């Protein structure tokens, strides 16, 4: 990607993201711009970049999972919204430990955001439509980009404990937010799921991690119903399916966000190995605390480049 100054007669200087994902200013001209295009590099004007940046009209939505709600403290708030005032969100819902039910609209490092520091889950008895209510809300607020962060188990042999970027998913919940007769805001339920996790956002996140020295892995996510953790047989099945991470959320949210035309970035904190007999909700919270700084740096780094 090359971002070139639109007002320069020679297409000026801009930011070029090379194969190492580092960014440097480079002088260019009309010939340079044509050369970049010939090499398959996307060249866009500064004006176009400004029109696509997050704005008050198009904030970035961030949905946070178990133990990751601390990111909400980074927001310079303009407005707060109780989840129970969001259309479609169940009024009787109460947050589990590590979640909060108050969205914050504001900015992080000057970037307009809407942060949702908690979720509800299928295993609590809620429907696919209810667990995706936050996605519909973000879409109606004008969000074009949405980040999903979740706590997961790392499938032994395919991933390690730590931060990860989701590349694809397998929906094993038996539920789908596009099934049924209530298809508000969605043109058709027959949605192709190729690149449900937007490729350029994945590349951007990987580049930010490399630049900041943050260790991240990449892999496929499997969404399961929960609340039980995986049996050894289930872990073996997931390993054979080339699944790297498994968790109780995210899969349905990604389906709806993709169907709504939103750009999706999936990030995970693998707090344990799937099938670990010592696994508990408390251990997830403790792992989230250990990785809090790196997670915050990664999110802030991606936001700065949008």
Describe the predicted segments one by one:
Residues 10-11, 15-39, 44, 101-111, ...:
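Mid-sequence, gly/pro-rich, charge-dense loop/helix-turn segments that line enzyme active sites
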Residues 50-193:
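Metabolite-binding pocket within alpha/beta catalytic cores that recognizes anionic/polar moieties
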Residues 138-142, 239, 258:
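Non-catalytic positions within long, well-ordered alpha-helices that form the structural scaffold/packing
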Residues 144, 244, 263:
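Short acidic/polar active-site loop segments enriched in Thr and Asp
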Residues 186-197, 235, 287-300:
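Polyanion-binding loop/helix "lid" in catalytic or ligand-binding cores
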Residues 248-283:
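Zn-dependent metallopeptidase/amidohydrolase metal-coordination segment
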Residues 274-306:
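His/Asp/Glu-rich mid-to-C-terminal helical/loop segments that flank catalytic regions of hydrolases
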């Amino acid at each position: 990607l090359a971002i070139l100054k639109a007002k320069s007669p020679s297409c000026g200087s801009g930011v070029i993201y090379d194969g190492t994902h580092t960014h440097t200013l480079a002088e260019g001209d009309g010939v340079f711009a044509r050369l970049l295009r010939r090499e398959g590099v996307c060249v866009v004007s500064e004006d176009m970049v400004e029109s696509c940046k997050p704005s008050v009209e198009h904030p970035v939505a961030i949905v946070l999972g178990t133990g990751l709600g601390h990111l909400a403290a980074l927001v310079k708030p303009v407005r707060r919204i109780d989840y129970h005032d969001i259309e479609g969100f169940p009024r009787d819902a109460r947050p589990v430990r590590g979640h909060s039910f108050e969205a914050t609209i504001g900015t992080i490092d000057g970037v307009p955001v809407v942060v949702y520091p908690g979720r509800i889950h299928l295993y609590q008895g809620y429907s696919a439509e209810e667990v995706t209510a936050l996605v519909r809300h973000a879409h109606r607020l004008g969000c074009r980009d949405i980040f999903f962060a979740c706590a997961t188990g790392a499938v032994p042999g395919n991933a390690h404990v730590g931060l990860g970027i989701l590349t694809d998913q397998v929906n094993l919940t038996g539920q789908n937010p596009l099934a049924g007769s209530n298809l508000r805001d969605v043109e058709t339920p027959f949605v192709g799921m190729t690149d449900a996790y937007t490729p350029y956002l994945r590349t951007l996140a990987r580049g930010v991690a490399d630049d900041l020295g943050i260790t991240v892995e990449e892999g496929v996510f499997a969404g399961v119903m929960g609340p039980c953790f995986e049996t050894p047989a289930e872990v073996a099945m997931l390993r054979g399916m080339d699944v790297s991470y498994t968790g109780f959320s995210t899969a349905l949210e990604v389906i709806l966000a993709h169907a709504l035309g939103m750009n999706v970035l999936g990030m995970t904190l693998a707090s344990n190995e799937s099938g670990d007999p010592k696994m508990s909700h408390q251990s997830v919270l403790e792992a989230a605390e250990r990785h809090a700084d790196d997670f915050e740096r990664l999110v802030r780094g991606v936001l700065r480049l949008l």
